[in-house]
């Protein structure tokens, strides 16, 4: 999770999922926005073909939260998001998942620091590799105010870093596309 949380690098996490026992033929992929990262209000899309939906009924995800040193979202319960029933039928409207701001995690790997040399990724002019080690543990993020007013490389200024309970952070929508 460290590479994902700090730099948005999915390669290590993907390799770990592929090497896990009992998951032959699993489905994984990356969903990007127009510029790689998904900006506020933007949509990212991906297309995946289930190998055996009766055996692979659940959806798992993880994503870096930017800008940050090591904030991320992801489900901590592998059976939290069911998208197929026991017979492999798509569950339709159950394929919409709202991720709340209160579900943002801090990986505990780097101290939050929005300065140019602070190691936060996706801040204009900053080196995403230079963060100070925190030696913490994964916990719910309680504060991202360090990033209030910073600019991203795409020119977006972060104006709201409030982590209010009940606020939506992301929507994941899974739809079934009929076979042609």
What residue ranges belong to the model's regions?
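Intrinsically disordered, low-complexity, compositionally biased regions/tails
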Residues: 29, 33, 92, 99, ...
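Short loop/turn segments at secondary-structure transitions that flank enzyme active sites
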Residues: 65-69, 105, 178
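Long, compositionally biased interface segments
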Residues: 130-180
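Structured domain cores in non-transmembrane regions
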Residues: 1-87
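A broadly tuned preference for mixed-charge, low-complexity surface segments
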Residues: 1-24, 108-138
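An exposed acidic His-Trp-rich patch
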Residues: 70-127
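A structural detector for beta-sheet-dominated domains
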Residues: 49-51, 84, 100-102, 141, ...
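Glutamate identity and glutamate-enriched acidic tracts
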Residues: 2, 6, 16-18, 42, ...
């Amino acid at each position: 999770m460290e590479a994902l949380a700090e730099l948005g690098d999915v390669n290590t996490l993907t390799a770990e999922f592929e090497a896990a026992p009992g998951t032959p033929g699993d489905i994984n992929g990356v969903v990007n926005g127009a510029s790689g990262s998904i900006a506020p209000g933007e949509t990212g899309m991906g297309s995946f073909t289930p190998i055996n939906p009766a055996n692979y009924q659940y959806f798992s995800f993880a994503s870096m939260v930017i800008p940050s040193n090591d904030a991320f979202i992801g489900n901590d319960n592998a059976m939290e998001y069911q998208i197929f029933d026991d017979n492999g039928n798509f569950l339709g409207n159950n394929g919409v998942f709202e991720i709340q701001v209160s579900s943002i995690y801090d990986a505990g790997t780097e101290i939050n620091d929005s300065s140019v040399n602070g190691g936060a990724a996706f801040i204009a002019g900053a080196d995403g590799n230079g963060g100070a080690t925190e030696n913490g543990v994964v916990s719910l993020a309680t504060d991202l105010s360090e990033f209030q007013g910073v600019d991203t490389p795409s020119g977006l200024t972060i104006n709201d870093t409030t982590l209010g309970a009940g606020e939506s952070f992301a929507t994941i929508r899974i739809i079934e596309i009929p076979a042609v």
